Regions:
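Interdomain "pre-motor" coupling segment immediately N-terminal to P-loop NTPase/helicase cores
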Residues: 16-68
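Phosphate-binding P-loop
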Residues: 92-100
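N-terminal pre-Walker A segment at the start of P-loop NTPase domains
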Residues: 70-92
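Charged, compositionally biased N-terminal leader segments and the immediate start
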Residues: 1-20
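Conserved hydrophobic/aromatic pocket- or pore-lining residues that grip, position, or stack substrates
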Residues: 75, 117, 135
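Walker A/P-loop
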Residues: 105-129
Length: 248
């Protein structure tokens, strides 16, 4: 009865892994000969590991990666991509996030920017950091709706929170003035407070052209560019083509 009560109390406290491990110990003859301290240590380790794994799963789910299977180890370093493997390895340690720096991921369509960004994001979740991936068109739509229903400041705060924000399709299209001001709000909210990865087909002069208003463009770029590492992918062949169906 005492054992059953103990298991029930563990479950009631939501220590379900520890409860199961405790029951397993009762039938394991090898563990029966261990000291109380060692047995208890095993129970704590199993509960701690389960909680860490569940936390990681939640972080990955909430990040909403478009490439959910992306990882640093699977990045392809073809010669024509001119990727600096040592640089990416350094960035995968996530020190740039601790230092509140950004990453500019620049390259033509199909060069694999999104995959690399998601791989870096996955590395951040492995370090138990909050990450959020979003395409810029979706972000602008969300901010436009928020302005209309009175939740604008709340949404800005939501995008201020993640330790790493990944914005894909950055400035792919020319902005309206209200959209440019929205991006300035995001840039200001995260400036020197959190890190952002910007995936873009265009270099900085191209950004200014897409933003339009030169004053807003200066304000946005000043909050992003001077605090960023750059990864420039000079890809001769699209990664989509490389991974597409081969002719028989």
């Amino acid at each position: 009865m005492l054992i059953e009560n103990t298991v029930n109390k563990l479950n009631e406290m939501r220590l379900t892994t520890m409860a199961k491990a405790f029951k397993d110990q009762l039938t394991d003859t090898n563990i029966a000969n261990m000291s109380f301290e060692d047995r208890f240590g095993l129970l704590v380790d199993q509960e701690w590991t389960a909680r860490k794994n569940n936390h990681l799963k939640r972080l990955i789910k909430n990040a909403r990666f478009s490439e959910s299977g992306a990882c640093i180890e699977d990045i392809e370093y073809h010669a024509d991509r001119n990727l600096d493997k040592a640089q990416i390895a350094r960035l995968s340690t996530c020190n740039y996030i601790t230092e509140r720096h950004n990453i500019l991921l620049l390259g033509a369509t199909g060069s694999g920017k999104t995959y690399i960004a998601c791989a870096l994001g996955m590395a951040a979740t492995r370090n138990f950091l909050q990450v959020r991936y979003i395409r810029l068109p979706e972000l602008l739509t969300e901010l436009s709706i928020a302005r209309g229903n009175g939740t604008y400041r709340r949404v800005i705060q939501q995008y201020k929170k993640p330790a790493l924000l990944i914005i894909d399709e950055w400035l792919l299209y020319p902005l309206k003035e209200t959209e440019a001001r929205d991006l300035l709000e995001i840039a200001e909210a995260r400036y020197k407070k959190a890190s952002t990865i910007f995936c873009s087909q265009f270099d900085i002069p191209g950004w200014r052209e897409k933003i339009g208003d030169p004053i807003i463009a200066d304000a946005i770029c000043d909050r992003i560019v001077h605090n960023s590492y750059s990864i420039i992918i000079d890809c001769k062949e699209s990664m989509r083509k490389r991974k597409g169906i081969k002719e028989i």
